[in-house]
């Protein structure tokens, strides 16, 4: 969805090959005018949206009632597509760039400052979901001049001191470091933000008293990190700037 200056809204993508998207989650812009986005299943699950109709991946046994809590006339549907990543070309064409087989349940994604690398986070499946589900890690791909991806590698498994610091959102700074929001569950002191060098080495942490869902750099100098947590919005000034075109 793109909001225009006259307050109208333009739908950029709602389907792929005639099948409706799941629940587009995170999006990044490319200097060539394209938009790259992840399409995980979370909006089609009980705890974040409404479950599939009976027999769907998030309601395989058919015991959940997707109509509860919905307006009159709501018609439940079923997931139609795997959890993939897509690219919206400036022409409007939609291309599949990362498949569910490569990165199941994709979530946050980010380009390196020179746009030669794409980082994609894979999060775990939701309660009751029967899709493949991710492992709470992040992959990195090489990006060619024609926007083809190759050489997938695991960037990090996000295990710190034996604690799984589950990743969600990711942003890159001008030095190529990756800032990743962290969900460590009940492990006190491990939720917040982890910071990684391009080599995959952990170089910093920001500890928050809540699970951190997503992050972004902002402010007049793009040196302030905003952190959206479970019930709060945090901000901190950093000694770097968020990467962006121009």
Predicted segments, located by residue:
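Beta-rich, blade/repeat-based domains predominating
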Residues: 17-35, 71-72, 76-84, 94-120, ...
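Blade-edge beta-strand/turn elements of extracellular beta-propeller
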Residues: 3-20, 84-105, 141-162, 193-208
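Surface-exposed, flexible loop/turn segments at secondary-structure boundaries
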Residues: 8, 17, 35, 43, ...
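Asp-box/WD-like beta-propeller blade repeats and closely related beta-sheet repeat scaffolds
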Residues: 1-76, 82-83
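Short loop/turn segments immediately following the C-termini of beta-strands
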Residues: 40-42, 123-125, 133, 143, ...
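Structural motif
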Residues: 47, 82, 128-139, 188-193, ...
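Short loop/turn segments immediately following beta-strands, especially the blade-tip
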Residues: 140-148, 237-245
């Amino acid at each position: 969805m793109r909001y225009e200056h006259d307050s109208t809204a333009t739908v950029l993508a709602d389907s792929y090959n005639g099948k409706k998207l799941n629940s587009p989650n995170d999006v990044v812009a490319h200097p060539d005018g394209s938009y790259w986005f992840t399409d995980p299943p979370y909006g089609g699950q009980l705890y974040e949206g409404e479950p599939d109709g009976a027999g769907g991946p998030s309601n395989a046994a058919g015991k959940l009632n997707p109509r509860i809590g919905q307006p009159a006339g709501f018609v439940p549907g079923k997931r139609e597509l795997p959890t993939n990543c897509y690219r919206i070309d400036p022409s409007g064409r939609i291309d599949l760039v990362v498949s569910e087989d490569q990165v199941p349940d994709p979530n946050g994604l980010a380009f390196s400052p020179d746009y030669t690398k794409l980082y994609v986070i894979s999060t775990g499946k939701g309660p009751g979901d029967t899709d493949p589900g991710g492992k709470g890690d992040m992959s990195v791909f090489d990006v060619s001049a024609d926007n083809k991806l190759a050489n997938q590698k695991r960037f990090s498994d996000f295990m710190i001191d034996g604690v799984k610091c589950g990743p969600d959102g990711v942003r890159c700074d001008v030095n190529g470091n990756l800032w990743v929001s962290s969900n460590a569950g009940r492990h006190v002191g491990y939720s917040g933000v982890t910071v990684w060098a391009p080599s995959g080495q952990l170089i910093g942490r920001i500890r928050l008293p809540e699970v951190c869902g997503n992050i972004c750099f902002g402010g007049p100098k793009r040196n302030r990190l905003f952190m959206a947590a479970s019930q709060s919005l945090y901000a901190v000034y950093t000694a770097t700037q968020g990467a962006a075109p121009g």
